[in-house]
Amino acid sequence: ASSICDGFIIRRHVLMTPFYALRHQVRRLDEELCGNGGKYPTGDVLFSGEGKRIVLGKPIAEGGEGSVFTSHAASASPLVAKLYHPNQRMRWREQKLRLMCSRPIRSPCVAWPREILYDELRRFVGVLMPRADGVPLGAFAFHAELLTNQFPSWTRYDLTRLCLNLSASVHTLHRCGVVLGDLHPGNVLVSPDGSICWVDADSFQVEDYPCSVGTERFRAPELRGNYGDFLRARSHDAYALSVLLFMTLTLGLSPFARQGGEGDMREAARKGALPYPFASYRPPAGFYPPDTPGRYVWSYLPRKLRDALGHNLTCVQRRDLRPRVMPGYLARCLLQYLRDMEPGGGRDHPMYRDLLHDRPCPPHSLLVQMTPNVCTDCGILFREAPDDVARRLRQSHAKSLCKLCIRRRSALNQATRNPTTNH
């Protein structure tokens, strides 16, 4: 058996049987502190559960739960040590990590905990995990300039391959009985070839141990209360993944952003009010996408992918009887999208591989007449039909300008000619 991921196909001979059972009732967590309250600098020695010496290297990062260090240990692969802050060394965390280390998931798409770390008196202080290389998704994928600086050769084909790997990796973890819970762009590292690795796996939801953290933008609208008080379902991951895929495909545009509605995106998300049409859904009156290049990406996506993402973003599970589309189906839609962009496919045209667009998707008969150009105002690559060039010159825009920048200039000129006077 095989899974779509990381170069499209990864063998999952050990991933066919779920490692963890999905539960419906959160366990009562033992909040007793079990550590010694000490802090550990570079050079200190800790011990694994089997008694192996682990020497702390340089600090890599620090967060709300703890600090991450490089480590020196007798291991075939490089490892990092995550040491929890003294107030985070609870008994339930040690118990959860013991469960996770006893049933390790060996997959390149997740940095799964390997061994628990103790001090010389065998008091719990942290966990040992594989070191993952790459760039955090949120550090480059949500702005065209950052993306081209990080990966200069990437096109929409590479961006779609990245989305495929994101979907397939979540599907793989779901098959193992794991719910990610806190699924957001800071928890996934991306390599130049588009392969990905989820980090901070110690916060994943396994069995009846909840994921006690979350990110509001990726929180399913039907969820209420504190994150640690309930168990999440795979459907909640599907919602967060759909938000992440939309933002990645549009280079940072929130799915619920709209013209004139900057302050109420969370309310729109709660109601499932998307400003983009799909299938039989039409946006509410007055809901228009923001006037940015990312808005047009939606019209270039294949219909099945649009329908799946749109359904996941607009349905609220308490009032919609249709379940959300799962990551495995999203991965299949994205794989077909990739194949369509390859030579001989239905989307085998350079325009489909542009990162951003200044117009809705044109009919195929018009594509062959369009020539590439670079906007002198915003810098995006856009394409012009012969009629577009003539119209731009008639409007006295001698420089190459995309349609969005022509509209902005026209609006600015209009405002200059008709200034508003306050009496």
Predicted regions and their residues:
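ATP-binding glycine-rich loop module of kinase domains
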Residues: 57, 64-107, 111, 147-152
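Activation segment/activation loop of eukaryotic-type protein kinase catalytic domains
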Residues: 189-218
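Conserved C-lobe activation region of Hanks-type protein kinase-like domains
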Residues: 248-299
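Short linker/helix segments within small regulatory modules
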Residues: 386-400
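ATP-binding glycine-rich phosphate-binding loop
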Residues: 32-74
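Regulatory extensions appended to serine/threonine kinase catalytic cores
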Residues: 342-374
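Conserved structural core of kinase catalytic domains
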Residues: 111-158
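Catalytic-loop of the protein kinase fold
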Residues: 170, 174-191
